[in-house]
């Protein structure tokens, strides 16, 4: 599973909240974070990949084995909504991701001045995405209150139940080969870029 989105959207915070069950202090990701968490009685490997400029071209190395995408958007960042939309649609236009389910997390719902769900769906052109793949929108925060609920758990449960036939076949193939490029290609490519 890939965890993607613009920088500062809250990707890493969401990842470790899901893994550890609590909020931890994070710093901007330079390369990637990878963790395994239990979802619906299954072990799911989640790759949280930096969206910094030099790293973005490397995302394609993760695509062939992706069974689901979680795309995180900052609900308060009106100035970057066009960028967030373009980024999302560029990712989903890749051939390797045809039919892969995507969960869109409208994050930081605990903050003031959040855009409405309807406004964000329109600005991200969610209806267009839903024509070609399973896609759902979730309201998320790692600081829920009685008034502000979070759908983080529902998000991970939903996307883990929506694998494509192609991704299932690929997952089985690579599971039987622990030294396959599924693990090593992204790691080695990322390392070479980070130290250039």
What residue spans do the PLM features occupy?
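Long, low-complexity intrinsically disordered regions
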Residues: 170-196
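TRAFAC-class small GTPase G-domain
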Residues: 1-165, 194-196
């Amino acid at each position: 599973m890939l965890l993607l989105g613009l920088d500062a959207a809250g990707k890493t915070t969401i990842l470790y909240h899901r893994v550890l069950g609590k909020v931890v202090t994070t710093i901007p990701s330079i390369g990637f974070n990878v963790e395994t968490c239990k979802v619906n009685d299954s072990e799911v490997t989640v790759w949280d990949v930096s969206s910094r400029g030099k790293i973005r071209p490397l995302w394609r190395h993760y695509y062939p084995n992706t069974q689901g995408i979680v795309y995180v958007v900052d609900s308060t960042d009106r100035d970057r909504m066009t960028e967030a939309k373009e980024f999302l649609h560029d990712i989903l236009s890749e051939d390797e991701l045809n039919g892969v389910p995507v969960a869109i997390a409208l994050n930081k719902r605990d903050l003031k001045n959040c855009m409405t769900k309807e406004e964000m769906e329109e600005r991200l052109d969610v209806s267009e995405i839903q024509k070609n793949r399973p896609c759902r929108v979730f309201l998320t925060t790692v600081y829920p209150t009685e008034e502000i609920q979070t759908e983080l758990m529902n998000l991970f449960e939903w996307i883990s139940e929506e694998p494509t036939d192609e991704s299932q076949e690929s997952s089985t193939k690579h599971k039987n080969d622990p030294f396959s490029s599924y693990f090593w290609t992204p790691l080695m490519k990322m390392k070479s870029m980070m130290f250039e």
